[in-house]
Amino acid sequence: GSQLAGEIGAISAEHLIVCPPEGIASMAKGGVIACLLPATSFNLGAVFAPARDMVNAGVPVAMATDFNPGSCPCLNMQFVINLGCLKYKLTPEEVLTAVTLNGAAAIDLADKVGSVEEGKLGDLVIWDAPDLDYICYRVGSNLAKTVIKRGEIV
């Protein structure tokens, strides 16, 4: 799927767990966002996508939970963030981009959400953490202090 996504210039390639080097090269050439589901790999005991290789090749990476009762009963985005650093070997900054702006871009909504900018909907999480590294490597703790959706605290 990754190679075809690059060949046809898809916005994104979804559910990537296994992705050969040819697929990575094709996505890089086609400007395709690779959508990765680390909690699915974790739950299934499957391999983890070669995210570091993708980023090194210039492929934008997005990450999500893929919550479903069969292959991924995980709703926890902080766990996805943890896995992004620990299993994908991405930096905290790369992971933050993957779960925000690149995720929005993968569903063609980067003009509305994914970053804090004037004119966007105002979705934001305030973390109880001294820095971004703490969020990425503190596994098993809910560090979300405040969640703001469309400018309103929820």
Stretch-by-stretch model annotation:
Residues A13-L16, L36-A39, M63-T65, S71, ...:
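Thr-Gly-centered strand-to-loop micro-motif
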Residues G30-V32, A57, G122, K145:
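Structural beta-strand/beta-sheet cores of well-ordered domains, especially the beta-sheet scaffolds
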Residues M27-A28, F79, C136:
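Residues in and immediately flanking transmembrane alpha helices
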Residues V99-L101, L121-V154:
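C-terminal cap of metal-dependent C-N hydrolases
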Residues A39-F42, N68-P69, D131-L132, E152-V154:
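Short, glycine-/Ser/Thr-/acidic-enriched flexible segments
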Residues E7-I8, V47-A129:
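His/Asp/Glu-enriched, well-ordered alpha-helical/loop segment
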Residues S12, S115, T146:
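Conserved beta-strand positions that form and line the central face of beta-propeller blades
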Residues G1-A49:
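Active-site core of metal-dependent hydrolases
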